[in-house]
């Protein structure tokens, strides 16, 4: 069954500016600019009101799968707005039973070097995604902090670090060593 029209709106905060170029959304905020291309999805994007402070996503004559993209696009735009206002921060903790994992940050936080993982001599190097900065926490031992505006790049960088410390040819229920995401949040606290 096809639904005639499905639409949803996203409210845009005062300090955020959104521009549309076709189906490309550009979000400008206090922390920077993010752009995302939705050309592969057949929907209508429009800005509403005199001050253009609402973004509407329309889908005409869609089946169930196509209608789901409406909410997905709204969620992506909300994540972009949150990114340029508050920023995203992931915290990761080193876990080890015997050999202490030594993490060194190189190239102004864009390269992570992992040494002494399970006592190995091999140095694991993980490059951060563009726009993601990594630092070692001063308050907490064995903690990494990843910060950026794009939630997908920050979470992907965290995944690359976690996957770099996978234990091969051992029972992973016993060998729990690695670097894991311990906390997900924002750089600045939202005023609620």
UniProtKB/Swiss-Prot annotation:
It holds the Pfam family Ribosomal_L6. One of its GO terms (cellular component) is focal adhesion. Component of the large ribosomal subunit. This is Large ribosomal subunit protein uL6. Keywords: Acetylation, Cytoplasm, Ribonucleoprotein, Ribosomal protein. Its main location: cytoplasm. It is found in: Cytoplasm. The modification N6-acetyllysine is found at residue 121. One of its GO terms (molecular function) is rRNA binding. InterPro entries: Ribosomal_uL6-like, Ribosomal_uL6-like_a/b-dom_sf, Ribosomal_uL6_a/b-dom, Ribosomal_uL6_CS2. Component of the large ribosomal subunit. The ribosome is a large ribonucleoprotein complex responsible for the synthesis of proteins in the cell. Belongs to the universal ribosomal protein uL6 family.
